[in-house]
Swiss-Prot record:
Compositional bias per record (Basic residues), positions renumbered to this chain: 133-145
Compartments, record wording: Secreted
InterPro entries according to UniProt: Cathelicidin-like, Cathelicidin_CS, Cystatin_sf
Proregion residues excised on maturation: 30-130, 190
Disulfide bonds, paired cysteine numbers: C85-C96, C107-C124
One Pfam family per UniProt: Cathelicidins
This protein's name: Cathelicidin-3
Keyword entries, A-Z: Antibiotic, Antimicrobial, Disulfide bond, Pyrrolidone carboxylic acid, Repeat, Secreted, Signal
Region (Disordered): 133-190
Keyword Repeat on entry: yes
């Protein structure tokens, strides 16, 4: 009788352990939303960055259509911008203000939505920096030149003499060169 009780209690314990084993993996492998996975990737970018300030998510491209398999790698594309918070700050980047004229980077790669899997493969490149782009002032049309006034009746001003020729003796002109001596062409008869 005692053996039957022991086997029944052992059966119950094994059933409880089986149920517990089925429940625990699903709780530990909770899937992240697409945005949460991207925010984790931004945190990893900040951890590995050698720059002075933290980066914060600026723009997130739409998620891929097939988000059924949480463990598979998903293509992603997003933009981050430099914040005013130093990299050593304990403050999360989402609470930091964007730095005026801060660096902007476009990140492209793959992420996973599985919380236990911390794999991501991203390549972030600096976009044309806002601080380097200055808006050009609008081009205004050139002003038209003023028309010359019509001559008015009345006395005309006396024109000033030009600085040339100067008064004084004129130089003697050089004589024209004479033809060279030598054979003369013979005229042809008509």
């Amino acid at each position: 009788m005692e053996t039957q009780r022991a086997s029944l209690s052992l059966g119950r314990w094994s059933l409880w352990l089986l149920l517990l084993g089925l429940v625990l993996p699903s709780a530990s492998a909770q899937a992240l939303s697409y945005r949460e996975a991207v925010l984790r990737a931004v945190d990893r970018i900040n951890e590995r960055s050698s720059e002075a300030n933290l980066y914060r998510l600026l723009e997130l491209d739409p998620p891929p259509k097939d988000v059924e398999d949480r463990g598979a790698r998903k293509p992603t594309s997003f933009t981050v911008k430099e914040t005013v918070c130093p990299r050593t700050s304990p403050q999360p980047p989402e609470q930091c203000d964007f730095k005026e004229n801060g660096l902007v980077k476009q990140c492209v790669g793959t992420i996973t939505l599985d919380q236990s899997d911390d794999l991501f493969d991203l390549n972030c490149n600096e976009l044309q920096s806002v601080r380097r782009i200055r808006p050009r002032p609008p081009r205004l049309p050139r002003p038209r030149p003023r028309p010359l006034p019509f001559p008015r009746p009345g006395p005309r001003p006396i024109p000033r003499p030009l600085p040339f020729p100067r008064p004084g003796p004129r130089p003697i002109p050089r004589p024209l060169p004479f033809p060279r001596p030598g054979p003369r062409p013979i005229p042809r008869p008509l």
